[in-house]
A protein has these predicted regions:
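Nucleotide-sugar donor-binding loop of glycosyltransferases
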Residues: 18, 71, 150
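Glycine-rich, basic loop-to-helix element that forms the pyrophosphate-binding segment
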Residues: 1, 17-33
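Acidic helix N-cap motif at the loop->helix transition within catalytic regions
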Residues: 1-5, 28, 46, 50-52
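Short aromatic/hydrophobic "clamp" motif used to bind/position activated sugar donors
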Residues: 38
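Donor-binding/catalytic cores of nucleotide-activated saccharide
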Residues: 22-23, 43-146, 157-170
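Residue-level signal for alpha-helix termini/capping positions
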Residues: 7, 31-34, 60
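Acidic donor-binding segment of Leloir-type glycosyltransferases
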Residues: 1-16
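C-terminal subregions of glycosyltransferases and related glycan-biosynthesis enzymes
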Residues: 157-219
Length: 219
């Protein structure tokens, strides 16, 4: 099917690779990427027609953007959980302002366009769950301007059998480790972010009974 789809499309490359997980697939794509910007679409998901053109138009208007985040339908297909996460037209020159302003709540790799050079020396960790939360802060640290837009739309399909939906102790530990890895990057934390981390820590303890590792801060 993939071979037929790329016939006659000189701008498409078909890569064959054994299934090594999401991070390995993205990393292989990054090794072969040639354009100025890169983005990702997971195998269960899709984008609204016209999204690519709309986002490239935003990037043409704002060549200073190193990362551009756009709206996403969360848990598409699950009417009880489906939710639209949208954004205003905004630019952040501080990674800290973006992250503590709520960016930590939507660390998805897929509803963003990245300047390809940001991935120089940065790859997704193979074998870890919540790899997005681990990798995004590295990219934010290298970005000069992070933009958000209300244009375009990504559909994040609900998968009750997916790894994140069935996250247990090990997976939640990966998520907590991802946030702790970058804690010093943000300086003084907001109470809302610390509360989010505390909730993750409590979930980890509930699942594993391992001693808490989240630093105790005066909130």
């Amino acid at each position: 099917i993939a071979s037929r789809m790329i016939q006659g499309r000189a701008n498409c490359t078909l890569i064959h690779q054994s299934n090594q997980g999401l991070s390995a697939a993205r990393n292989t794509g990054l090794e072969h990427a040639k354009g100025e910007y890169v983005t990702f679409i997971d195998s269960d998901d899709f984008i609204q027609e016209g999204t690519i053109e709309a986002l490239l138009a935003v990037l043409d208007m704002h060549p200073e953007y190193d990362i551009l985040e756009y709206p996403v339908v969360q848990h598409h297909g699950n009417k009880q959980c489906e939710k639209l996460l949208t954004f205003s037209e905004k630019a952040f020159t501080s990674a800290r302002d973006y992250w503590l302003g709520g960016g930590y709540q939507h660390t998805y790799a897929c509803n963003k366009y990245y300047r390809r050079r940001l991935f120089e020396g940065v790859r997704y960790p193979v074998g870890k769950v919540f790899e997005d939360a681990y990798t995004l802060p590295f990219l934010l640290a290298k970005a000069g301007v992070i933009g958000t837009t209300g244009r375009g739309l990504y559909y994040y399909t609900d998968n009750p059998q997916g790894i994140t939906a069935r996250a247990g102790g090990q997976e939640l530990t990966h998520l907590l480790e991802a946030h702790l890895r970058h804690l010093a990057q943000w300086g003084t934390l907001t109470a809302a972010y610390y509360e989010s981390l505390l909730n993750i820590q409590m979930d980890v303890y509930e699942a594993t009974k391992a001693a808490p590792v989240l630093p105790v801060l005066p909130y």
